[in-house]
């Protein structure tokens, strides 16, 4: 999907929302179409939340080319964001995606909202809107540490 987004952009700057959709849609589509959605969700949860260094190293190795392609796309879509901010915002984006994939049922149990009734496309659009706002948020300077008396 990222190649399609690049082709559609042509000579124009790649849009952040197009990059986010290219990242989210295949993952949420796979979850929605997987006959055993629970297994897929557990795999995502384990990869993201498991503190197993070997598993994380394996997944980074498997996904290295995808990570590089999306890193370049985010850099292109957000040229003014420095590496540290990009890393943090990407970290928050990945957390929001993983939480949504693994815990959408919590929303239903707390609020009665049937997230499955809307289809994955609506969930993806909400996640795109939310994470795009986070990526575009003003860069804050950390508060200065006060000397203790």
Predicted regions and their residues:
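Hydrophobic alpha-helical connector segments
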Residues: 1-40, 90
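Short amphipathic alpha-helical interaction patches enriched in hydrophobic/aromatic residues
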Residues: 2-9, 52-55, 74, 78
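Short linear capping/connector segments at secondary-structure termini
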Residues: 3-8, 44-46, 109-114
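Short coil/turn segments at secondary-structure junctions
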Residues: 7, 11, 54, 58, ...
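Amphipathic alpha-helical surface "interface" segments used
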Residues: 11, 46-48, 147-149
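Amphipathic alpha-helical segments used for helix-helix packing
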Residues: 18, 35-64, 104-109
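C-terminal peripheral helix-coil segments that are non-catalytic and often amphipathic
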Residues: 18, 26-29, 64-149
């Amino acid at each position: 999907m990222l190649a399609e987004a690049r082709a559609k952009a042509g000579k124009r700057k790649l849009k952040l929302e197009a990059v986010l959709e290219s990242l989210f849609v295949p993952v949420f589509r796979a979850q929605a179409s997987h006959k055993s959605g629970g297994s897929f969700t557990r795999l995502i949860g384990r990869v993201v939340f498991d503190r197993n260094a070997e598993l994380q190293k394996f997944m980074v190795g498997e996904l290295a080319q995808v990570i590089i392609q999306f890193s370049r796309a985010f850099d292109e879509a957000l040229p003014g964001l420095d590496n540290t901010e990009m890393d943090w915002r990407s970290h928050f984006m990945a957390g929001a995606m993983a939480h949504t994939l693994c815990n959408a049922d919590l929303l239903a149990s707390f609020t009665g909202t049937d997230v499955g009734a809307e289809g994955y496309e609506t969930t993806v659009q909400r996640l795109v809107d939310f994470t795009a706002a986070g990526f575009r948020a003003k860069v804050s300077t950390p508060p200065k540490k006060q000397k203790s008396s």
